[in-house]
A protein has these predicted regions:
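Transmembrane alpha-helices and adjacent helix-loop boundaries
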Residues: 1-337
Length: 337
């Protein structure tokens, strides 16, 4: 662990595998070019959903994969982001772009306050505490008349497409680019965090808290920082989701299902690896969307059965996730100057 901390001090953050860099640059170029090929709205919606859940899974991976704390109530920050931007736009005509920023800071503050009380717990106790916190947020918003209680909030519709109001009625393409940019920003920030000194300290705390403390790392402080960063990444996805569907309610945006699904995506792809959440999302989101087409409604629970089968196979044969199928040397940073 000490050697890891030394590496974090000596190696440039920007040092990365050149092959991975060229591959990712090509993929990003293709993603930006995709709408130019007149892709139908379903595939745009599919990509939007992938971008959103990839960013959400990266958020959960910070607290679980980097710092080793399993959160079962992470959907609370998704809901806070959704309600922050929507409420400010409805009541004060504040653009959702500003509402996103408010949601990010609000989620960060709430995460710090929660962290001060529950991050002294660990293992199952922390997981149960976060589960109860997530449920508490849902119950509070169901009974809070100021934010619509159980009925939720409807985003006021604009007559025409508006970037200021983040509403586009004629096409999903603007939404596609907005979600894509936010996803890329999220991935880039996580990529930097993963290679930074604080990222190595997170992993030191995860691997051996006592040894980390003996090296001068404030364990509680770094757990709280990881929790706050994780929450601040989750919040803007809630804000964007609210603008995309134009209606939110506590059962939709504070749902326990959100927390579990994000956990599932990350575990499937590979916890603790920045590529894991992306891999898990790219595999499972199409399963969800196509099962709804083939079986109607919510997919007739077929998608849940498929998730269960895939998860059991992964847990038995690849406990480190699907990303472990990729040779480690391909994902390592290129240390050659």
């Amino acid at each position: 662990m000490n050697s890891k901390l030394e590496i974090a001090k000596l190696e440039p953050v920007w040092n990365t595998n050149k092959s991975i860099f060229y591959l990712m640059s090509s993929i990003v170029f293709l993603l930006f070019a995709l709408p130019l090929f007149n892709v139908n709205s379903f595939y745009l919606h599919l990509m939007i959903t992938i971008f959103m859940y990839s960013a959400m899974s990266q958020s959960w991976n910070v607290i679980a994969g980097m710092s080793g704390q399993i959160s079962l109530g992470h959907g609370a920050f998704f809901g806070l982001g959704a309600y922050s931007s929507t409420f400010l736009y409805m009541e004060y005509d504040i653009t959702p772009w500003a509402g996103i920023v408010v949601g990010i800071f609000l989620s960060g503050i709430v995460a710090i306050l929660i962290g001060l009380s529950v991050l002294r717990l660990s293992g199952h106790y922390f997981a149960i505490a976060t589960l109860l916190i997530g449920i508490s947020f849902q119950v509070i918003f169901q009974r809070w008349d100021l934010v619509g209680a159980a009925s939720g909030l409807w985003v006021p519709l604009t007559e025409f497409d508006s970037w200021n109001a983040m509403q586009f009625h004629s096409s999903k393409v603007p939404y596609y680019y907005i979600f894509l940019v936010f996803f890329l920003i999220t991935f880039f920030l996580i990529w930097l965090l993963d290679r930074s000194k604080i990222g190595f300290r997170f992993r030191a705390v995860r691997d051996d808290p006592q040894a980390a403390a003996s090296l001068g790392i404030n364990v509680s402080k770094h757990k709280i920082i990881a929790y706050a960063i994780s929450a601040m990444i989750m919040a803007p996805m809630g804000s964007l989701f609210a603008q995309y569907i134009l209606i939110i309610d506590p059962d939709r945006v504070f749902s326990f299902d959100i927390s579990i699904f994000v956990l599932l995506l990350t575990v499937l792809g590979g916890v603790g690896n920045i590529w894991g959440p992306l891999v898990g999302t790219v595999i499972l989101i199409p399963v969800t969307e196509y099962s709804r087409i083939w079986f109607g409604g919510t997919g007739g629970a077929v998608d849940l059965m498929i998730y269960g089968i895939i998860l059991m196979i992964i847990c038995v044969f690849r406990p480190a996730g699907i990303i472990s199928l990729v040779p480690a040397r391909i994902l390592e940073r290129d240390k050659k100057r």
